[in-house]
């Protein structure tokens, strides 16, 4: 949100520093799976489809299991899973690498990550988190770390 600067003249506008600080703080909360700044920086679905080695933007993980999700792209979608409609966008669809029972490239949604642990109890019920220490890197590097050819 822009506010008028000192003197109130239009050419002295600046960004609300509290809002920016709040947006930066959101990045440090691993339980916030898709903070505003990350959403803005996420490459749109299909934007890297012709890249040989796409950039991985975000990593999600099960804190008590072995499942990990690496998103290379993502876009808001409507209730039917479509991006290009005038309908209300109610979910976020990612494409990337999922490492669980066996590694695979495919689609997963923010809703799936949020509800993956429903019905579980105890430690197994700990929700999926976003790795706040993960830095964007090429998919080939992620595959190498997981010993995936």
Residue ranges and their predicted role:
Residues 1-63, 147-149:
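N-terminal domain-onset segments
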Residues 2, 12-17, 83-85, 90, ...:
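Intrinsic disorder/low-complexity signal
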Residues 3-6, 28, 79, 94, ...:
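Intrinsically disordered, low-complexity segments enriched in small/polar residues
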Residues 40-50, 71-88:
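Short linear motifs in intrinsically disordered
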Residues 55, 66, 91-93:
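Extracellular structured ligand-interaction cores
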Residues 57-78:
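Hydrophobic/aromatic-rich, well-ordered segments within soluble, folded domains that form packed cores
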Residues 80-102:
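Catalytic Cys-His active-site segments of thiol-dependent hydrolases/isopeptidases
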Residues 96, 101-149:
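Helix-rich interaction surfaces within compact, conserved domain-sized segments
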């Amino acid at each position: 949100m822009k506010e008028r600067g000192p003197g109130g003249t239009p050419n002295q506008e600046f960004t609300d520093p509290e809002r920016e600080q709040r947006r930066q703080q959101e990045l440090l909360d691993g339980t916030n799976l898709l903070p505003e700044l990350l959403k803005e920086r996420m490459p749109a679905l299909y934007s890297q489809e012709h890249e040989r080695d796409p950039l991985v933007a975000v990593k999600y993980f099960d804190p008590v299991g072995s499942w990990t999700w690496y998103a290379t792209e993502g876009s808001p979608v409507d209730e039917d899973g479509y991006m290009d409609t005038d309908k209300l966008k109610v979910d976020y669809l990612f494409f990337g690498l999922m490492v669980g029972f066996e590694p695979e490239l495919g689609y997963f949604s923010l809703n799936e990550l949020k509800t993956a642990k429903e019905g579980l109890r105890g430690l197994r019920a700990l929700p999926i988190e976003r790795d706040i220490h993960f830095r964007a890197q090429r998919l080939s590097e992620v595959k190498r770390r997981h010993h995936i050819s």
